[in-house]
Swiss-Prot record:
<keyword id="KW-0997">Cell inner membrane</keyword>
<dbReference type="Pfam" id="PF00346">
    <property type="entry name" value="Complex1_49kDa"/>
</dbReference>
<comment type="similarity">
    <text>Belongs to the complex I 49 kDa subunit family.</text>
</comment>
<dbReference type="InterPro" id="IPR001135">
    <property type="entry name" value="NADH_Q_OxRdtase_suD"/>
</dbReference>
<keyword id="KW-0813">Transport</keyword>
<dbReference type="GO" id="GO:0005886">
    <property type="term" value="C:plasma membrane"/>
</dbReference>
<comment type="subunit">
    <text>NDH-1 is composed of 14 different subunits. Subunits NuoB, C, D, E, F, and G constitute the peripheral sector of the complex.</text>
</comment>
<keyword id="KW-1003">Cell membrane</keyword>
<keyword id="KW-0472">Membrane</keyword>
<protein>
    <recommendedName>
        <fullName>NADH-quinone oxidoreductase subunit D</fullName>
        <ecNumber>7.1.1.-</ecNumber>
    </recommendedName>
</protein>
<dbReference type="InterPro" id="IPR014029">
    <property type="entry name" value="NADH_UbQ_OxRdtase_49kDa_CS"/>
</dbReference>
<dbReference type="GO" id="GO:0050136">
    <property type="term" value="F:NADH:ubiquinone reductase (non-electrogenic) activity"/>
</dbReference>
<dbReference type="InterPro" id="IPR029014">
    <property type="entry name" value="NiFe-Hase_large"/>
</dbReference>
<keyword id="KW-0874">Quinone</keyword>
<keyword id="KW-0520">NAD</keyword>
<dbReference type="GO" id="GO:0051287">
    <property type="term" value="F:NAD binding"/>
</dbReference>
<comment type="function">
    <text>NDH-1 shuttles electrons from NADH, via FMN and iron-sulfur (Fe-S) centers, to quinones in the respiratory chain. The immediate electron acceptor for the enzyme in this species is believed to be ubiquinone. Couples the redox reaction to proton translocation (for every two electrons transferred, four hydrogen ions are translocated across the cytoplasmic membrane), and thus conserves the redox energy in a proton gradient.</text>
</comment>
Length: 417
């Protein structure tokens, strides 16, 4: 009798469900996965090495391009590490703005994940729903930085500028008539804070719509329940963080466990799962979006009542205001030297970590006292999460590997760095 052998299959890197450039070598027994071997490095851009030849400010835009779905969160960790080395205190208003935009970014990330995960399971409607709200969030990015994705808005010592008093508005064109423009601009006539406040009031109903589509949908449950189960103990041993860890029942959240900025002033809950399967990871992320919405609302209320500076008043670290540059030679010199030579950071090393939408995102900087880092190390959450892929897929069907990969929430910009 002929011996039946397992066969290998390449999944990706061009597969639409590979979430980037993942090459997954699967060993299959029929349609059952016996081994899953992730091959990474296809998006390696040497970010850590490039940072060694750039000033601290010049490296900031690289952070946006790591996890390019959670841009400002990457900047946040980088700025915190530099500020720890410099020993500076960020103005309280800037801290609130940072926290607010970190939570806006968290919702952006989870909406992208939810839409693409639903799409992977065959529910393309979910993608249309989530991108509807994501458009408003990207407009919030554009209002403060001029960019919808790679904002470079957080700076060492604060943020680039204060929140604007107006919102960009749509204009009639060949593809948009006056009626559609009026509908699109209906909540854009006030300030940015008014626009964000309006979003926080609308969003809970939108989250209800996502749950109506998926939570009790029998096909969605068949694709996710008891798939890719990881216990709490095993999740910690694997180094999983973020929703991957919390879905297994471990209430570990850097915003609560090791609060940074003004998270200790915020009132929010940490959603945790029970069984640690794909379905729990879905429920945790949807609940996280609701909690992020609560935090954003608290930040909006505080920012409305408390004006103030948004960056440190030290022109060796932060650029002077443009109005002053045009009338004061000293401020012009500060600006010129800051953007040509950068600023020197005291010798030492610092690690700063934040609760990134995907888990613990850390930046480790070693300084030799120069204007460039001697060594920059990035701790991406996706790298540890992806390492569990083999264990989570074993014994499941080939189609289930797609859902396991989806609930890991992998973006290869930060995995490959």
């Amino acid at each position: 009798m002929a011996e039946i052998k397992n066969y290998s299959l390449n999944f990706g890197p061009q597969h639409p469900a590979a979430h980037g450039v993942l090459r997954l070598v699967l060993e299959l027994d029929g349609e059952v996965v016996q081994r899953a071997d992730p091959h990474i490095g296809l998006l390696h851009r040497a970010t850590e090495k490039l940072a060694e030849s750039k000033t601290y400010i010049q490296s900031l835009p690289y952070m946006d391009r790591l996890d390019y779905v959670s841009m400002m969160c990457n900047e946040h960790a980088y700025c915190l590490a530099i500020e720890k080395l410099l020993g500076i205190e960020v103005p309280i208003r800037a801290q609130y703005i940072r926290v607010m935009y970190s939570e806006i970014t968290r919702i952006m990330n989870h909406l992208m994940w939810l839409g693409s995960s639903g799409n992977d399971a065959g529910s393309s409607t979910t993608l249309i729903y989530t991108f509807r709200e994501r458009e408003d969030l990207m407009d919030m990015y554009e209002a403060v930085s001029g960019a919808r994705m790679h904002a470079a808005y957080f700076r060492p010592g604060g943020v680039y500028r204060d929140l604007p008093d107006t919102m960009p508005q749509y204009k009639a064109s060949k593809v948009r008539n006056a009626r559609s423009v009026e509908i699109m601009n209906r909540n854009r006539h006030g300030s940015l804070l008014d626009f964000i406040d309006d979003f926080t009031q609308r969003f809970p109903k939108c989250a209800d719509e996502y749950e109506t589509l998926l939570t009790d949908n029998r096909i969605w449950k068949q694709r996710n329940v008891d798939i890719g189960v990881v216990t709490a103990e095993r999740a910690m041993n694997l180094g999983l963080t973020g929703p991957m860890l919390r879905a297994s029942g471990v209430a570990w959240d850097m915003r609560k466990s090791q609060p940074y900025e003004v998270y200790d002033r915020m009132d929010f809950d940490v959603p945790v799962g029970k069984t640690g399967d794909c379905y729990d990871r879905y429920l945790v992320r949807v609940a996280e979006m609701r909690q992020s919405n609560r935090i954003i609302k608290q930040c909006v209320d505080w920012l409305r009542a408390n004006p103030g500076p948004v960056i440190v008043d030290n022109h060796k670290i932060a650029p002077p205001p443009r109005e002053g540059m045009k009338s004061n030679m000293e401020e012009l010199i500060h600006h010129f030297k800051l953007f040509t030579e950068g600023f020197r950071v005291p010798e030492g090393e610092a690690y700063a970590a934040i609760e990134h939408p995907k888990g613990e995102f850390g930046i480790y900087i070693v300084s030799d006292g120069a204007n460039k880092p001697y060594r920059l190390k990035i701790r991406p959450p996706g790298f540890a999460n992806l390492s569990a892929m083999d264990e989570l897929c074993r014994g499941h069907m080939l189609a289930d590997a797609v859902m396991v990969l989806s609930t890991l929430d992998i973006v290869f910009g930060d995995v490959d760095r």
